[in-house]
Amino acid sequence: MHAVVKWLYLLALIVWVGQVVFFSFVAAPALFRTLSTVEAGRAVGAIFPTYYRLAFACLTILLLGDVLFVVTGTSRAWWTASTCLAAAALAATLYAGIVVQPRATALRPQLHAPEAPPHVRAEFDRLHRLAVQLNGVALVCGLAISAMTAATLKP
């Protein structure tokens, strides 16, 4: 059973970090480079619910795996640190997906209206910056977890 848990842990880590990197550095920039801002925003908005659900699932698996490895494994200090990082990444992702993204989505229809007040653009920009920062925190946590996981692998 321990091999299955390790496999699920590694799969969740790979899928989650891969999706963050792909979306942040490939998909979103390509959409905004090739489509109008309105269409790119609509496309990204359509991706976000699945993006966050997948991240929540992967991070939950990581967190459960980390706790299991702390309790049953060696390298407890590494796994405790990994648990803290996974919890931080999950908190950042939950906040981005449950609080920030819905607020930004609610503002999107007003952004491109001719009579859109300036405070709408300012609030959307603030939410976007916050979402990018939270995503960055999650990515740094994921890269650190990847490095710690690699350090604990047995040849």
Name every feature range the model reports, one short phrase each:
Residues 1-155:
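Polytopic transmembrane helical bundles with strong interfacial aromatic enrichment
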